[in-house]
């Protein structure tokens, strides 16, 4: 059990909770600890993806505050979390520009994905399992005689996973709204908890912010992000772009038959183009 020393998650939940978010996967309350420190209580809903949230808690325990919010306690489907403030990386994009936001993300990922002495939690999901929807969609397309981006991306993903260099614990869903500026500096929240090459841990950033297609489709931005992340993570930018392309096609497979699928595929195609022409 990882209940906090001061109080169980369920006890804290009774202290003046203010509901601040109601998402498809959880209810999120802001609470005060006995000493007045703000904290977050996250109540998980009984959804199909609850395993992601539970793995994410194991990831936070493993990080122990290094680049991520601290998990202060957990009880059944309640989590007591360090309060990470209200300022997101998306605010930096809006106020100071995308370049500065990318540099902040690169610096944080360098800390988050650095080699660790701590053994990886056994609960973390292997990256290949995370890509199941892409591999299935690629098989379906191939069986139908279609050579699609899904087929191409599945081949690339399979090759990279088969000859992976060092595996690290990954956040798994990093984007501009779960990188927060806290009293301890920039931290991540809401991890999924994966194990894979570091480039896969950066891939989702190329598709964000979600409302800024002008950025996500811009070849200069794609190249600038690849270069910044390549330096920070010590990864070949070509491999990073391949991972970002494959990840976008995975996201598109999850979002099949909707507007999001088309958005994901358009950005993935732009990433593939930059990879082929600039590197």
Set out the residue ranges of the language-model regions.
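Short, small-residue-biased leader/transition segments that mark boundaries at the very start
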Residues: 2-4, 8-13
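Protein kinase glycine-rich loop
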Residues: 18-22
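Active-site acidic catalytic loop and adjacent metal/ATP-binding pocket
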Residues: 25-33, 40-41, 71, 155-200
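A conserved alpha-helical element in kinase catalytic cores
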Residues: 37-80, 87-112
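A glycine-centered beta->alpha junction motif in the catalytic cores
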Residues: 46, 80-98, 114-117, 132-142, ...
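An alpha-helical support segment within catalytic cores of ATP-dependent transferases
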Residues: 114-172, 182, 231
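ATP/Mg2+ or Mg2+-diphosphate-binding catalytic cores
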Residues: 144, 251-279
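Active-site Asp-x-Gly
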Residues: 181-227, 231-234, 264-267, 272, ...
